[in-house]
Amino acid sequence: MYKERIEAVKNSLEALECDALMVLSSDAHLNEYLPLHNRRLQAISGFTGSAGTVVLMRQGHSHLFVDSRYHIQAEEECGSLFEVHKLGMEGVFEAHKWIGRQDLKPLKIAVDPFTITPKQWNRYQSGWEKTGHRWEVLEGNAVDQVWENRPEKLNYAPFALGEELTGESSISKLGKIRDMMKQNGAEGLVLTMLDEIAWLTNLRGSDIAHNPVFEAYAVILQNRAICFCHHPDSGITKQRPEWEFFPYDDYLGFIQQLAQESSGKIWLDPEATTMGTRTVFDNSKVLELQNPVVMAKACKNRVELNCSEQAHLHAAAALVRTLAQLEERMESSLPASEAWFAELLQKEYSSEAGFVDLSFPTIAGAGSNGAIVHYGTPSDEKMLEPHEMLLVDSGIQCEGGTTDCTRTMSLGEPTSKQRELYTSVLQAHIRLAKQVFPEGTHGAALDSITRSGLWNQGLDYGHGTGHGVGAFLNVHEGPQRISPVSHDVALKPGMIISNEPGFYETGWGGIRLENLCRVKTLESGLNHHPGGKAWLGLETLMFVPFDQKLIIRDKLSSDELNWLDDYHEKTYQKLQKMLNEPKYLNWLKKACFPLEA
């Protein structure tokens, strides 16, 4: 199937007189998690990961570029048809840089402009100046044209959230955004990203699995707020009278008219708009800056934080019940598979008040599968073995909050290697959880601090240490992150971010320990900063015990022991009232027993 599609695309490239096609893992809204009908990278390659780039050469091999999360997965899924470029390995280049090194002749690279940002477009093009390579804009999408039996587009009517969940009305949010537009001299603002539109409208949807968003565009003017969606007549106008709702397909015609009639600047975020939208407007009429919704959404208000805290308690209670049942089953020597565990966890999650959906498909990787960072569908054939560990990464969408938690558990008596490595990863987690930092600190600095103990042992992990998370929105949210990749956004109070160091060894397994945290201002107990800056820290939101069988107590410092015992004490106090059955309460009490005792 994939081979035939690749050949069909190559034939179309020949007809278009193009040398290559670039297929990115995005769509017209730059989604990370895609609806089925927009998974073009998967349709052309078979790769099911959430991030990657395909380059199909009209003559020669097909190429797939993936980061370290997907090295193993990409080889397993696509290695027979694609040359897999494992980013992060020595001598391996990103897709656009690899293209830049093909210097026998200038190349025409075809791309769908509605899947690439202006920032990407310009960065790639500037890197090709010496070779003369250039973009070729496609009318339509080349993959769509060869994708037989493409899934139907799912679009549902959005639903409104009250201020008891959002903490602020859409009218108030629009007022603040318009003030920032005035300050920056913008007549209009165009929004493409679905979580930004959902946040600004105080609407949610179910057009993408596990992401409570609806497919839409938005245009904000000083006297109008227009939303282009699939159900403009569904009754949301009565709930949001400050907005005008039009059919989704009217968007392109509207911005074309806006481009002709506007006399002022139109604000387009170069990292959150597609080149398809950007090319509608003359350069002289475009204000290219990060749009004002990005930071407003990232820094949660008190209501959003309270709702997130409640969501985490519900998720923690469900996860504790599941872990208790897992331990009971393993001790009884009853058969259990990865799929059994994932199904049990979803059952427990869905029983919690306010549950809406999982926040992403559960990762339950046993043994060597734990080394696949974004392991796919848990297998009903992979049985849980007593000598192995189980890595579980899961979360929920709960009314008002989004969770994401990873725990790695021993399924029997752990080996010395498992305990050594688990304890090292736990120490990295504690290091970040305890870290104090001045305002203005970027995530790259905290990333290095978190990894330092692992580095001293010759250990590391290929993914970032932390990603932002939304408030009943996407489980991956920008711009905040804790990563080696430098980013120009400092961590600010109210941001929610993950703390998830790890270790992975192909053929052996993986360890990851993840809690979500909120960035907060530290009010007392610290010296005055010489620059007058506030001191910030992270407050943990998730409370699920760490596996004490895997912890080498004597390897922990007194400060680390105190942090861990305090964390487990808080875990017990917060969850004991949510666990009605004695067997779960007894399991929790045992799991939270202080190591210093």
Role assignments for model-derived ranges:
Residues M1-A597:
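Active-site neighborhoods and metal-handling regions in enzymes and metal-associated proteins
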